[in-house]
Swiss-Prot record:
Coiled-coil annotated spans: none
EC class (word): transferase
Organism whose genome encodes this protein: Nitratidesulfovibrio vulgaris (strain DSM 19637 / Miyazaki F) (Desulfovibrio vulgaris)
SUPFAM superfamilies named in the record: C-terminal domain of RNA polymerase alpha subunit, Insert subdomain of RNA polymerase alpha subunit, RBP11-like subunits of RNA polymerase
Family affiliation: Belongs to the RNA polymerase alpha chain family.
Highest taxon listed in the record's lineage: Bacteria
Protein name, as recorded: DNA-directed RNA polymerase subunit alpha
Primary gene name: rpoA
Amino acid sequence: MLIKQGDRLINTRNWSELVKPEQITRDSDPADAMYGKFVCEPLERGYGTTIGNALRRVLLSSLQGAAFVSVKVSGVQHEFTTIPGVLEDVTDIVLNLKQVRLAMDTDEPQFLELSVNKKGAVKAGDIKTNQHVMVLNPDLHIATLTEDLELTFEFEVRMGKGYVPADMHEGLSEEIGLIKLDSSFAPVRKVAYTVEQARVGQMTNYDKLIIEVWTDGSVTPEDAIAYSAKIIKDQISVFINFDERISGESSGNSSGSSDVNENLFKGIDELELSVRATNCLKSANITLVGELVQKSENEMLKTKNFGRKSLDEIKRVLCDMSLDFGMKVDGFEKKYQEWKRKQQNEA
């Protein structure tokens, strides 16, 4: 379908005729908040690797997480020293602290404390958290006290992304005794993907993307993938140099003096859709094709009981009429009323 925008023609077939995934399914325990295996199919040949690699890189590098950025230990001036009565030296303790995984529900820095006074193991679960911060691996070993003594740790927790070296944190105090920490904010620990063949009808030259995601528990695998997809979408949208909500005025399928595709004025009942799809549209108060095409695919998928199968069914019907979702139809109601009057006059 060719659509005129300004002084140029936009060929919507560049994207409208590509096969799109019918569904994304989870092939792992949905109750597991730290591991997810997902299958996305069908994809155009080569798109499995393209999408899988892009998602993997963003998952590992760009998602927000929480981590310690500094620590103060009572009686300690710097990290290259030892603490009497503690088995580990301060350097080893700092390395252990970097492994503590945190979840935080605020962008504001938080300050936590850990105080011990008895001989024994000190673990991450001993950290006194608040309503904004949660320790995700409380069994992580931090230090071992070989005798009874009072020892206090003071931490600053921040949100961030990726890996930030200690000297790159902004706004930290330079006071003696404050130890700046290298921080790994990334909530995704590991990502792996494979690409297999998928079948569409009798054709087997399509891709099936299988992606596995391991997180630290501060974000679910589903949300991690969703955030990454959103990041990619936002970053590449700048390359689109035309109005994505393509106008419903067609250069190739026009009729009448207004050059409007008259299929826009058809009622939903005229499309011979399945009962399920028709009922979903009616429940969303969509009665005309012109109202339908102005909705995006994502908007439609949020409609109650409206799934990918109904979406694909409607897309095929719209395509036969040289229409698609996400079209811009300026002044549709006015055009519809003019068309109705014209039909009445001709009758």
